[in-house]
Amino acid sequence: MKKQVLSVMMAALVLTAAAQNKKGDKLVGVGIGSISYTNSDSKTSYSNTPTVYKSDGNSFSISLNPNVAWFVQDNLAIGGGVSISFYNSKSNSSNTSSSATTESKYNQPSFYIGPLARYYFGSSEKGSPFVQANFQIGISGGKSTSTSSGGSSSETKTKPKGDWNGGVTFGYEHFITPNVGLFGSIGANYGKSKTTYEYRPSTGTGYDYTSEYSRFYIPVNVGLQVHILGKGKK
């Protein structure tokens, strides 16, 4: 009798695991793109002057990538995702020819949103490889300030005028329970950005300038994914 009960429980577990990528189920998760902290100092000298320029500072950055999607057919989920990141830095600079020092601060939050499609290859109870395509439009704006010990200061604000990226990601998800998985992925993305900067000094006349650039990068993610059974499923 005990063997029969155990067999039924094992069969139910396998069926649940195999059903987590079925049509009507939901996919909810979050990935950690990167976390970094840097502490640095530097000295720069030139051949045409005895002055030595010094600087020291630190920076911190973090990015998160939550997502939600619905399985429109077995193993294929369609939905959307966001990428949220924050960068903060602070530095101090001086030189040996002057007693003046300058403190600089920079804050840059970023927010991207867009659609995604993920396809799982198979539905093993242990895990599944997957491929994901995504496209996102970005909204990011930051501010930097510079203050000297002599009393002068300046502020620069950034305003995005067009920022987007798209790409393909390949990964593997390992199921730690029938409905919860840990995943790792690596991809290839391409994007373009256009940003306007507003420079405003405490004295003198300010000005605006615009920069445009394109980028190719390789995103690496690890995170947690939850598979929620569709309505009426147990």
Summary of predicted features, one role per range:
Residues 1-23, 232:
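Bacterial Sec-dependent N-terminal signal peptides
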Residues 20-70, 78, 221-234:
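Short glycine/proline- and aromatic-enriched beta-strand/turn motifs that initiate or cap beta-hairpins
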Residues 23, 73, 122-126, 175-177, ...:
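Outer-membrane beta-barrel channels and translocator barrels
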Residues 24, 58-62, 107-113, 127, ...:
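Residues that define the transmembrane beta-barrel architecture of outer-membrane proteins
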Residues 30-34, 64-72, 82-84, 115-119, ...:
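Residues on the lipid-exposed face of transmembrane beta-strands in outer-membrane beta-barrel proteins
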Residues 39-50, 90-101, 113, 141-155, ...:
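Outer-membrane beta-barrel translocator domains and adjoining extracellular loop/strand segments
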Residues 41-43, 87-91, 174-234:
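Predominantly the C-terminal beta-signal and adjacent terminal strand-loop region
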Residues 47-120, 124:
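Glycine- and aromatic-enriched membrane insertion/assembly motifs of diderm outer-membrane
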